[in-house]
Amino acid sequence: MSGVNEIRSTFLDYFAKAGHEVVPSSSLVPKNDPTLMFTNAGMVQFKNVFTGMEKRAYDRATTAQKCVRAGGKHNDLDNVGYTARHHTFFEMLGNFSFGDYFKDRAIELAWTLITKEFGLKPDKLLVTVYADDDEAAGLWKKIAGFSDDKIIRIGTSDNFWQMGDTGPCGPCSEIFIDQGPALQGGPPGSPDEDGDRFLEFWNLVFMQYEQLEPGVRNPLPRPSIDTGMGLERMAAILQGVHSNYDTDLFRALIDAVAHAVSRAPEPATMASYRVIADHLRASSFLVADGVLPGNEGRGYVLRRIMRRAMRHAEILGAREPTMFRLVPTLVREMGQAYPELMRAESLIAETLKLEETRFRRTLERGLSILDAESRDLREGDKLSGETAFTLYDTYGFPLDLTQDALKARGIGVDTDAFAAAMQRQKQAAREAWKGSGEAATETVWFGLRERVGATEFLGYETENAEGIVTALLRDGAEVTTLAAGQTGLVLVNQTPFYGESGGQVGDTGLILAPGVRARVTDTQKKLGDVFVHHVTVEEGTLSLDQPVELKVDNVRRKAIRANHSATHLLHEALRQVLGDHVAQKGSLVSPERLRFDISHPKPIEADELARVEDIANAVLLQNAPVVTKLMAVDDAIASGARALFGEKYGDEVRVVSMGLPVDGEAAQPRARNFSVELCGGTHAARTGDIGAITIVAESAVGAGVRRIEALTADAARRHRAEEARTLAALAGILKAPVSEAPDRLTALMEDRRRLERELAETRRKLAMGGEGGPGSGAQQTEIGGVAFRRSVIEGLDMRDLKPIVDEEKKRLGSGIVAVVGIGPDGKAGLVVGVTDDLTARYDAVGLVRAGAGALGGKGGGGRRDMAQAGGPNGAGAEAALDAVAQALTEAA
């Protein structure tokens, strides 16, 4: 018993037999915890249980928790690959007691597991306890038979754990193994404790106090246990190796890397193999948990992890996307323990492939600019923070890649200036935002809920109801009345108005009383159960404690219901057409249209959209009832209902089922309906009430996220009618029947492209002065012994200039070519080419930047042998070429 999967199973089975609930790993994205970027410990999903804010059906639990440490203060990224045990992704095995057993049972369970189940030799083990924890020391003596020299008292924070400045806390006891004198290092607490000989592998936290303020701790009424064992460390111990990367799981991944790059590992390159193996795990699990690469927050950390691995793949000689080829090996090794990995396999592979393709473009472009900006820097110098920030902000070149690229030359980066530039950008963004003023009322909601209670929502059953006004607010403050002409916020004890949530917009309508009429322009939901009606009083005065009639705009609500039900049908249809990796990333359900964001790494083809539309409309034609029922959340998910990523559900949830399986097969395991989702929104009564579904747009909203926009009911029919009229008009212009219009238009477009190619070729020949001679107006001189050929060409854009420069370079054999093309709009493009024998002396990027200013442009980019720039000032063409010549003279 030493394989990673077997060790994990043994741990969980052992604690299950000891009366613990085996709880699945929570997502790497913590729910409702803004203090954490990623889940980084087993106790994270139980934080509210430990504090008493949440109750579970069990008081003992055990988990194998996915963890990532690559952002914020818990950041191991830079060390990964270069040490034996640093990882961005790791698994933490743990057992937990919520007020059930305490120190004696925790120590007994741990000791039995490691000595009996795992077979570790007792004489190789030792422990630490907190300096004042005599109880734990005594228990180790009693249970393990340890002598005093095997129980090391530590008085530092390493052996006292706190959740925060206040809250549950308590002493720790860490279990170590002595790996023998062949390794360097001393026992914990000694001056050389950081060596590898004594390895800590399990931490037992005894939560027995509540920290109230500095220096004040009270005993907890129900002391608890939180333990954490690194699976990778335990695997290394049981497999008799001294590096986590030599365990069976990592050997399989490293072998896959070697196969992908066609290169066997060597000591000099082993760090790169380790980086790729580790980062593959982090990247894949983060994507499976809904994180996609981006430019901020979690997405940016994921992008850094991915691109660090991709750069190491390039170091190993990979010239094509490589990471995605490793995903099947990872799924084979870890998919059984984490089924979400199997479900998301295609999304993970597509995301890695797309990101690596983008990264190669970024790397080439960024390195070219970085080379030009750092050309004059010497060893010990620093690249300016502003330049590094421009590379990051404009070109997507991460700071750590800039640092890595300059490291070999001994050049640093002014990271303080980089951070300052980043802060200025954030501040500018904050100042650009203009709030609605409602933020001033946020602190009010907590007090109101305590005083007047939650709002009872009646909107699932009715669109009209009676209620009592429980609170009125105006300009962020509580008031007792709202008079005619005034706007404000109204709370009632019960309401049929739906408060905006889950992507569905809030209801509008009327609040009425004798002599009073207030128009509800929006309804929001605060703290999950306080419904806030935004009103404008049109007649009379609305008063506190006043009985009122609440009437939802039922025409608008009907359209919203249809659109919300349509999102469910589209969600399932998209999964059927595109694959199980599709997950909802956001939505907007309004009366006019619906917007639906999904995880998918590439544009959705027109034929795929047509299939999605056909499947969804087939369910509409069934006119099947839309059934909603309340269920326990675990029972709902077990029955096949889909839970949306990132949503937090209570113990009881609403399950919305609609339609029959299309083509005779259930789309969801164990589900007898086409779509079954957890949802708190309002829905159509039958699928036929949706009328029709028409997809009107598909676009990208970020890396790996696509947006679908659609219409339903009358809006869908009107859209189709307008499309038909437009198509008929186009057919009339083309003088063809509607059925032949696409072919006729295709033929016209092909003719146009052919004529454009012929025109471009004619212009190129005219610019070159015919097949055999130099272009008219071209001038050739020698500068510093190097041939320099320059010309200005009217009527050519940038894409036409590059072939001309390439041709001129061939004619010259050795030399430099600079050509300015002036378009019909007066804008100009400058292309500079340097023959291969001169690129060591001259850089086309530097030369093109010298001339860009005369054209009214800034910068320029490319490679040492070919670069381009542009600007609005075609009149400066000759001045631009003069500037290039001057730069050549100075370089000579």
From Swiss-Prot:
Zn(2+) binds at residues 564, 568, 679, 683. The keyword RNA-binding applies. One of its GO terms (molecular function) is alanine-tRNA ligase activity. One of its GO terms (cellular component) is cytosol. GO terms for biological process: alanyl-tRNA aminoacylation; negative regulation of DNA-templated transcription. Keywords: Aminoacyl-tRNA synthetase, ATP-binding, Cytoplasm, Ligase, Metal-binding, Nucleotide-binding, Protein biosynthesis, RNA-binding, tRNA-binding, Zinc. The keyword Zinc applies. Its main location: cytoplasm. SMART domains: tRNA_SAD. Its EC number is 6.1.1.7. It is found in: Cytoplasm. Binds 1 zinc ion per subunit. It catalyses: tRNA(Ala) + L-alanine + ATP = L-alanyl-tRNA(Ala) + AMP + diphosphate. Its cofactor is Zn(2+). It holds the Pfam family tRNA_SAD. Belongs to the class-II aminoacyl-tRNA synthetase family. PANTHER family: ALANINE--TRNA LIGASE, CYTOPLASMIC, ALANYL-TRNA SYNTHETASE. Consists of three domains; the N-terminal catalytic domain, the editing domain and the C-terminal C-Ala domain. The editing domain removes incorrectly charged amino acids, while the C-Ala domain, along with tRNA(Ala), serves as a bridge to cooperatively bring together the editing and aminoacylation centers thus stimulating deacylation of misacylated tRNAs. Catalyzes the attachment of alanine to tRNA(Ala) in a two-step reaction: alanine is first activated by ATP to form Ala-AMP and then transferred to the acceptor end of tRNA(Ala). Also edits incorrectly charged Ser-tRNA(Ala) and Gly-tRNA(Ala) via its editing domain. This is Alanine--tRNA ligase. It comes from Methylobacterium radiotolerans (strain ATCC 27329 / DSM 1819 / JCM 2831 / NBRC 15690 / NCIMB 10815 / 0-1). The gene is alaS.
